[in-house]
Amino acid sequence: MYFHENEFQFQSFIRIIKERENIDADIIEKDYYVCTVLKELAKQQDYLKAYFKGGTAVYKILDTMNRFSEDIDLTVEVVKEESNNSNKTRLKKSALGYKIPGLELDKDKTKDVKQSITAYYKYNTLFKDEENPLHKPGEIQIEATSFTVSEPIEVHTIEPIIYKYANKQEKDMLSKEFDIVPFEIKVQKIERIFIDKLFAAELYFEKEMYMDLSKHLYDLTILFKTKRIQQFFKNIGEFEKIVEYKREEEIYRKGGVNKNIQIKDFGYFNAEYNDDLLKAFKLMQDKYIFKDEYRITIEETQKALNEIRDKIVLLDQIKDLEKARKILNGEK
């Protein structure tokens, strides 16, 4: 039995966690449904070769990330030894194959474009926040793509908010009665997610979609502070390889970032933030940041972006010097 099938107990428990941790009830509820889907995915990953990525992945695997993310993004491996039909079947099942009571696939909204499928699952939300609602209340979006290389991949253990903030007695109840426990899932490495977000931010900046842009700018700021991303900038070969994966993906993606624009020239690095973006950045944090101590200022974000751009410029300079050295030495 799923926890949400016992509506009274489910609703009451979410209210307990809400009061204890001061986290909006609609966020706790949606996080539960997101994790329920991800747990089903984790059971099938060896076959599906579908890996968790994006902002929700970062939010679930990093203790330092406290921005709630409500969509599920998946990268589905293209296996060259398999037929096109076999690869397409795995892609479809990754987005459309979840049979969970209380989650209804909205077939009319489903989008199937080339190597990308976006599915929408409805659930009956018990908590409607009229003043500051989620971007997609009562709905989970799953986007599965099979553009290019999915790697690099690593394994992480994740858990829903209701388990994370439960006490020992409550965790025992969740585990024994509803099988709600931490579980392992294969995730794209945060280095790849970081590069993806550099490009996603540019896409939303160009389209003036400031709420989505604000989420990526927040994530980039937090990710940049981690030891792994700091080390990532010191590994030129790995950095170039992952950027190349992303460049190839953007070619296949409808409306992707122009291949001729260098990362250091992305518009959001040099833009003067207008009132619409500043308003969106505040609204994003008002709803999606769990606690006040995890809020950041736009100045902190701009400082981090300047440092990111400077590091990318330095990498380009090192690469150019290496090319010049090889030419002088007659190397290929």
Model feature map: region roles:
Residues F52-T56:
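Glycine-rich beta-strand-to-loop/alpha-helix junction loops that act as flexible
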Residues Y59:
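Nucleotide phosphate-binding site architecture
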